[in-house]
Each structure stands twice: as C-alpha cells, then as structure tokens.
C-alpha cells in the first residue's frame, strides 16, 4: 500500500481534526450535562 506523502499528510490531518472535534464535542456535552446535574 503506497501512499504519496501529501495524501498521507492530508489523511492524517483529517484524522487529527476528527479526533479534536470529537474531543471538543464530547467535552462540551460532558460539561453541559454536569452543569445540569449541578443546577439540580
């Protein structure tokens, strides 16, 4: 499986962006849920 460096970098950048977005989304949901529990 041979991938050109540019394509590989593009793939890793997308993968990294997806992980960062997932972490941000998960953290936002977690904090919003925690905030609701604290308010109750």
From Swiss-Prot:
- Per the record, the domain of life is Bacteria
Question: According to its record, how does it sit in the membrane?
Answer: Single-pass membrane protein
Any single Pfam family the record assigns to this protein: PsbX
| Residues annotated as transmembrane | 10-30
Q: Which Gene3D superfamilies match?
A: Single helix bin
Query: Where in or outside the cell?
Result: Cellular thylakoid membrane
Glycoprotein recorded as keyword: no
What is one process in the GO biological process aspect for this record?
photosynthesis
A single GO CC term, please?
A: plasma membrane-derived thylakoid membrane
For whether the record's keyword set contains Thylakoid, the answer is yes
Q: Which UniProt keywords apply?
A: Membrane, Photosynthesis, Photosystem II, Thylakoid, Transmembrane, Transmembrane helix
Q: Which family does it belong to?
A: Belongs to the PsbX family. Type 1 subfamily.
How is this protein organized at the quaternary level?
Answer: PSII is composed of 1 copy each of membrane proteins PsbA, PsbB, PsbC, PsbD, PsbE, PsbF, PsbH, PsbI, PsbJ, PsbK, PsbL, PsbM, PsbT, PsbX, PsbY, PsbZ, Psb30/Ycf12, peripheral proteins PsbO, CyanoQ (PsbQ), PsbU, PsbV and a large number of cofactors. It forms dimeric complexes.
Q: What does this protein do?
A: Involved in the binding and/or turnover of quinones at the Q(B) site of photosystem II (PSII). PSII is a light-driven water plastoquinone oxidoreductase, using light energy to abstract electrons from H(2)O, generating a proton gradient subsequently used for ATP formation.
Protein name, as recorded: Photosystem II reaction center protein X
Species of origin: Acaryochloris marina (strain MBIC 11017)
